[in-house]
Amino acid sequence: MTNKELQQLTETISLAFFKRPFTHTARFNNRLRTTGGRYLLKSHDIELNPKQYERYGKEELIGIIKHELCHYHLHLEGKGYKHGDKDFQEWLAKTGAPRYCKTAQDEQTVLVYTCTSCSRTYHRRRKINTQKYVCGTCHGKLKFLSKKVLHQRK
């Protein structure tokens, strides 16, 4: 899907579900990692994560667009557009938009380190500089053991 097709889809959804036109820009942003999309308050544009579309398809993308359009239309009307606001939650329910999107991360990995002195194991999501950090129990040297994949998304 191109940005032009995304723009047309967003305008169509806005008219169908909100009975209001979407007059700004909707585009894909490859730098989005932990979110499905975002509404930009200053420019009123909507940015969407292309990985959500690639991984979960058009239905999930439509749900994310509806969610961001709730932010968009409520903000332009001067009503509560934040997640905790009552107006926003009512509009989510009315349009059938999801409150959260599915996760976009490919896999969840854990790095396993062990102490060379006391054999204590450490499970971390981020790398540890073994030259700088030591065991919290005995101050022994840490050694990298393995990288485990907890679960892989399909």
UniProtKB/Swiss-Prot annotation:
Its cofactor is Zn(2+). The active site is at residue 68. It holds the Pfam family SprT-like. It comes from the Bacteria. Coiled coil: none annotated. Binds 1 zinc ion. Transmembrane segments: none annotated. Keywords: Cytoplasm, Metal-binding, Zinc. GO terms for molecular function: zinc ion binding. The keyword Zinc applies. GO terms for biological process: response to stress. It is found in: Cytoplasm. Residues 6-144 form the SprT-like domain. Zn(2+) binds at residues 67, 71. One of its GO terms (cellular component) is cytoplasm. Belongs to the SprT family. This is Protein SprT-like. It comes from Shouchella clausii (strain KSM-K16) (Alkalihalobacillus clausii). The lineage of its organism: Bacteria, Bacillati, Bacillota, Bacilli, Bacillales.
